[in-house]
Amino acid sequence: MTPLRLDEGGRELFALHLTPPLGRASGDAVVLCNPFGHEAIRAQRFYRVLGYRLAAAGLHVLRFDYHGSGDSGGEDADFDVHGAVADTVRAATELRRRSGVARLSLLGLRLGAQIAYMAAQALAAERLVLLEPLLDGELYLRQLEAAHQAELDMAFGPRWAREAALRAFNAGRDEALGFALTPRCREQMIAVLREPVRACCRSVLVLSDDAAVAARWGGIDGVRCIASASGVDWTTSDSLNATLVPPAWIELVLRELSPEPAHA
């Protein structure tokens, strides 16, 4: 595993390049695209396990943080969707250069699925894996707001119901579970999820148990939808240190991206 710092025009990204074992490189590479904010923390262990398994199966794997998130440069208020797409394109281009592979795949969870889909079009990616992709930006923002308010309620206890001034102080919509959520980012989340989806890769795998997700993606050439849920509430801090690794997803992704059958 090689840590990387990618700096272009002061927009610094932190990445980890996982390489396949000697003699097992398949000629394939995959970039893992994080979800938004707190959800990226929830998904960290899942991405780590998945990255190691994919590398062991022969793929070059890149995990990275968007500018304004994780260990990359910038403040969290610097994050927005279009910037994250550009970061993904830059990270994937660097992975192609370092690995020398021709076949590139992208994988993303929730908002990361939308980012992966948008970046795949610019990269002419071979394959795309979308894990519980979002459908509606306004609905997603309401869910984030509800989760944020629930966390405040839990943190402040009886004071939350009793003290109107406390609720008013925390009533802004510029934060979600400890991460900045700027008006620009909110607007972009709504706008990009309103755009109709279209064919972009030779093969697209969608994992979600939401029938509306299957309806949105299922009629597109090259798309295969599997009704499979993570079983994880990505927007809560409950059991934050628990093992949030959906085992069925690991096997389905390995089967989709591995050049040969995966072995446990």
Language model segments and positions:
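Short glycine-enriched nucleophile-adjacent loop
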Residues: A113-A124, L128
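The alpha/beta-hydrolase serine catalytic core
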Residues: A124-A264
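Short, surface-exposed "cap/lid" segments of acyl-processing enzymes
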Residues: G10, P20-D65, E94
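An N-terminal hydrophobic leader/cap segment in hydrolases
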Residues: M1-G23
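Alpha/beta-hydrolase active-site loop signature
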Residues: G37, Y66-D71, L135
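Gly/Ala-rich beta-loop-alpha elbow adjacent to hydrolase catalytic centers
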Residues: L107-A116, E132
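Terminal, non-globular segments
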Residues: R5, A15, L62-R63, E256-A264
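Catalytic nucleophile-loop/oxyanion-hole region of alpha/beta-hydrolase
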Residues: S69-R103
